[in-house]
Structure formats: C-alpha cells, structure tokens
Amino acid sequence: RDSIYTDTFGVPHIFAQNEDDLFYAAGYYAARDRLFQMSIVNFSVRGELSSALGDELIDSDIYLRTWRIHDTAKKLVGELDPQTVQLINAFCAGINYRIQEVYNDLPIEFKLLQIKPPAWNPSIVTGYGRMMAREMSSSWKPEIVYGAIENYFGKEKLKEIYPYYSDEHPTIGCSSL
C-alpha cells in the first residue's frame, strides 16, 4: 500500500507501489507545499507572468516568448518516450488534483492577486526544465572563455580584450581545480 510520511523537518517521504503513484504523490505534495511558486513557474513557462503579477512584467513575458520556451517544450514532449510522458502526466495529475482540492479556498497569495492557479501538463514540466537549463548555463560560457584567455595570455591581455572584465568576479583557472 502507498504511504507518505512527513518527517520532523517537514520533508515528505513517499513509499509507492509503482512509479505512477510515486510521481502522482510527488506532484501532489509539491503543490501542497508550493502551489503559488509552482503557479508562477507555470505562468513563466507560458510567457504570461504579466497576467498574474502585473504589466511591469511584460518585458519578462516578451523575453520568455522570444526564447520560445513553451513552444519548444510542447515539441519536446512529443519526442519523449511513452513511459516518461506517462510519469510526467502522473506528476501533473497530482498537482492538478491539489489545485482542485483548494480551488474554492485558495492560499492567501492567490486571493491577494485575484488569480487562480493554472492547470499543469507535460509541456509546463519540460518547459520549466528548459528554463532552468537556460538559466544555469547563461554564465558558464563567458567564464570558461575568460579563464582560457587568462591562463594562456595572462591577466593583462584579458583586461585588454575584455576591458569590462571585473576582478571582483575572478575566473577559476583549470590548474586551480
């Protein structure tokens, strides 16, 4: 039988008979604890932050839509193997069940902003993965280039080539690793 135990630190431990139940429970418990945050992620993936948080985020929506996060995520779902899609669907079903449970009495953040949590589907999950990959990879390339130039030519040449390079954010050369 499936069971969930929440430890003294508030961390849920899920014991499931199969992967579908595991992913469903993971989605449900994530939404139970972080529904507002997850809703902001959902709006972000779709490039619709301004619809939830105001017109000052239109530039963010334009940026996210320019990168075609959601469009690409939809295509990615179509390229995934059926088992992976099934598990992502189970995860989304858990989230959506939690949304249904609280829909008529939403957490305070939703009431204050007068918004409803959007439903989840596999393209939101893969879109969030794409957003995170982009976010985490956005600064590594310049740092590698800076480090290579500094290691090969020295710090003075680096500053000559990149005059705006800051010593406050030094690169870590390969020999330092």
Regions found by a protein language model. Give the residues of each.
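Substrate-recognition/specificity elements adjacent to catalytic centers across diverse enzyme folds
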Residues: 3-177
